[in-house]
Amino acid sequence: MSKSQQNNWAQYRPEQTQGGAGEISAIVSGIVSRIQTVTLVRVVKTKSGGLAPVGLVDVQPLVAQISGDGTVTPHGIIYNVPYFRLQGGGNAVIIDPEPGDIGMCGFCSRDISSVKQNKAPSAPQSRRRFDYSDGLYFGGFLNGTPKQYIHFKDGGIKLFSPGDIEMEAANIRLNAQGGVSSTSQTFQANTKTTAKFTGGGGISSDGDVKAKDVSLLDHPHSGVQSGNDQSGKPVAT
């Protein structure tokens, strides 16, 4: 008996080699073993991403294959798997997978090659079913501590990044029932036209305030005369 035949026999339990119900069970098990459902995978490569249409990833299943004689063999790479993005119409949260991420890969019941190309209803290119070639990636499972995040917790929401946070819109409004505060070392507002601050409580400063080149704390006046006359306007120092 050849080694391959020995391996085939090793895949079956003794009761499955004696005919009858055991043989039927072996046949069903063989069919089911060829059906891919979902499995954990690690991202090997990300293609596209950022402010672009949803891209693809190359992934490797984490649960190894076992032959009939017990030999453990790592899975190969599954290429060009579409990944999930939280998106509705033109609105999206862009968090692209990165190499090393662990996620779930689900496998479709039919060949989705044409749909991936056309992004429209299409006929299957083959009769394959539940195949590794028709996977979809959903991240992230079993991953480490994030470095930047949005944390929804009791009492509020925390947005954190060790880098810069940029907001860009036609208009940005901050509506706070209490107040808006900043503990940063500097606060700078550069407007192209008009900067306006209004409020019933007034504006206070622990340091100097300048209007163009005129200091509020230390400025001379033009046209100063003695007596009851008023001085001229403040001038820059």
Residue ranges of model-derived segments:
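Hydrophobic packing positions characteristic
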Residues: 2-178
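Intrinsic-disorder/coil detector with helix-boundary
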Residues: 2-5, 13-16, 170-237
